[in-house]
């Protein structure tokens, strides 16, 4: 999250201006920690190119649906409560209509707050309490399932390869 908080990885399209880049950014962060994508055609979580990506890679609701229901390869998460959050966990903000519109990743803690990183409005170490929202949900990364050895971090974090 720190490496690309205020810039864009050359490996990924920016979706600012066409719905926002927040979930794309958080997906990149989750991928940096898991190194596994799920290429399931209709219900996957993957990015190969700007035109070959899963809705869950860039869409707030699709991301939530994939992460909380994934039983295949890749990362999986569960709904949790504020006290159950750890570094790398995810927060989503919503409105009174029940629509969730923003995805953030936890990068630190204060005694009574979370520090988050996000894109669309690029931030790093921003206190969650400075956001305005009507609804909130918390996602804890439970783990990652992989069917091959995992080794992608260095090339990925340096913007060299997915």
PLM segments and residue spans:
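Short intrinsically disordered, low-complexity coil segments enriched in acidic
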Residues: 1-5, 9, 81, 142-146, ...
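Generic hydrophobic, helix-prone segments enriched in Leu/Val/Ile
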Residues: 1-4, 34, 100, 116, ...
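Low-complexity, Gly/Ser/Thr/Pro-rich intrinsically disordered linker/tail segments
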Residues: 115-121, 128-162
